[in-house]
Amino acid sequence: MQIFDTHTHLNVEEFAGKEQEELDLAKEMGVVAHNIVGFDKPTIERAMELTGQHPELYLTLGWHPTEAGDYSPEVEAYLLEQLKHPKVVALGEIGLDYHWMTAPKDIQEKVFRRQIQLSKELDLPFVVHTRDALEDTYAIIKSEGVGPRGGIMHSFSGSLEEAKRFMDLGMMISFSGVVTFKKATDVQEAAAGLPLDKILVETDAPYLAPVPKRGRENKTGYTRYVVDFIAGLRGLTTEEVAQATYDNARKVFGLD
């Protein structure tokens, strides 16, 4: 069985010195490929270090909406240089975060739009973070347009109808441990109802640990629980969902 964790943060302080232990556990649970997401300079640099040490790791680099206030021509030049790395598979995570509101909405929108444009110029898919901002996120993606490489709605927390709207724009829908939460019925309906070739799985580790590990530090190996849960929702085997989402990840990341 092969599982691809399409969004994890092995590059943050919580995992410092424990990366090999995390990857060993992941392998035991069938998680054989990992997309490490760098969202500011320290996490970008650590992600690049890790991918140089572990062949099963891939890179997504971008400027997170909570850091949008720091975006500048110098930051963009830095990003463009790092995005030349041969293991880069996407640009992100980018988007809107109205929960923390560390930057005004207009600044977040400007930085989001600019990075969508960059992803198309670089022929990369883009990975979207949206929190308390789903309608504005949709409007911006619709107006900017999705390039031929597509994009990913990371840790999707909306309904089936909302997911279909993003899918119709050319986006893949990625499910994290949120789908396993008891009250996340809308997300569960989306995971059950979308075409299997349009979904991905992730952990967003160390955040959002799935049931039965909810409330603890998340681990990239716990993608297995997300796969198990979605398989149950869809009446499929774990192996079927694992292989389908693995193949979907390789396709969107241009690894085939």
Task: Label the model's feature ranges.
Residues 1-256:
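Mid-domain alpha/beta scaffold segments of enzyme catalytic cores
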